[in-house]
Amino acid sequence: MKIYRSDRFKKTYKRLPDKVKNSFQKQLRLFVENQKHPSLRAHEIVNTPYREFRVDLQYRVVFRPYEDGVMLLDIGPHDVIDTWSRRGG
């Protein structure tokens, strides 16, 4: 699976605390191995082509699946999902 990172994701990721970056790397490894791993709690964002997975209790990753992989779109506190759900499809 190919992992693409949007410019927005890259910019936001750089500003994260090291602890969150470490948690993200761990969760990304799980995601690549098994997108349905229970600790990811991955699911669709209602009425959008986007999905999310859990980094930790507070942080989430928004992504969009493609045939050859996924595009990581954003990472941030849980309310980042609200921004993407308002965007719709």
Regions found by a protein language model. Give the residues of each.
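Residues at the C-termini of beta-strands that transition into short coil/loop
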Residues: D7, V46, G76
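Conserved short hydrophobic interaction patches
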Residues: Q27-L30, H78
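Enriched for short, Lys/Arg-rich terminal
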Residues: K2-Y4, V55, Y59-R60, R64-G89
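Non-catalytic, surface-exposed connector residues within folded enzymatic/regulatory domains
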Residues: I3, N22, K36-S39, I75
